[in-house]
Amino acid sequence: MELDRHFIERNDFQAVRRGYAALTLEIRGFGERRDRRPAEAREERFDPDSIDPNVTCKHAAMVALLLGRTSLGEKILDLRRAIDTLASFPEIDTGRVYAVGNSGGGTLAWYAACVEPRLRGLILGSCFATYAASIGSVDHCCDNYLPGALRWFDFPDLAAVVAPRPLVVVMGRADPLFPLAGVETAYRRARAIYEAAGAAGRCRLILCEGGHGFRPREAWGAFAELVGG
């Protein structure tokens, strides 16, 4: 399955068709928030074909480290401020705020749910595996890395903070960035945590054929079953 470069826009429409209000974030380093430095200051000068001009997260991540922060932390702040904005609209049911993210967006949603209790459920696509199987052994965007994280926890261990909120994980069996064995190991650990929290029925893993990309039909269908609508 080829990377669907328009999945964010279509996710908006999918959510609205299901009766949800939808807000899409322009993530730092992407789209209108991409790196706008002159070309001679950027990595493309070494290999013009090495970087998608619309995905420029590396420099922002490095500058965040220079400032004693992380790009992931900055993105979490953006997401929390977006929820603040949603909460200012009286027609929004703040008891039913959910996050849907694919790849880096899914990673962001997972970490954000650990510090943002207003996120009441998650759909994560193409992002769920152990550190060792994914970012520890396969080249990834540098903003996926948290300094020192593995000293304290692995990616699925964060379920201890997220549970018992509804969780749907949708992965491709042939995703080169998140190998299947690492996905299955991670989900077993997360599910065990949900079981310990008395919420085994509130998490689900869906494995699809193909590689890296979002699967809306499977994702939304499973999520509707978990949240009842």
Give the role of each language-model region:
Residues 1-80, 133-138:
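Cap/lid segment of the alpha/beta-hydrolase catalytic domain
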Residues 58-69, 76-82, 96, 119-160, ...:
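Mobile cap/lid helix-loop segments that gate and shape the active-site cleft of serine hydrolases
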Residues 86, 106-117:
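Short glycine-enriched nucleophile-adjacent loop
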Residues 86, 90-103:
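Alpha/beta-hydrolase fold nucleophile elbow
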Residues 162, 169-171:
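Short beta-strand/loop motif that positions the catalytic acidic residue
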Residues 173-178, 213-214:
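Acidic catalytic loop of the alpha/beta-hydrolase fold
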Residues 188, 194-229:
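C-terminal catalytic histidine-bearing segment of alpha/beta-hydrolase fold enzymes
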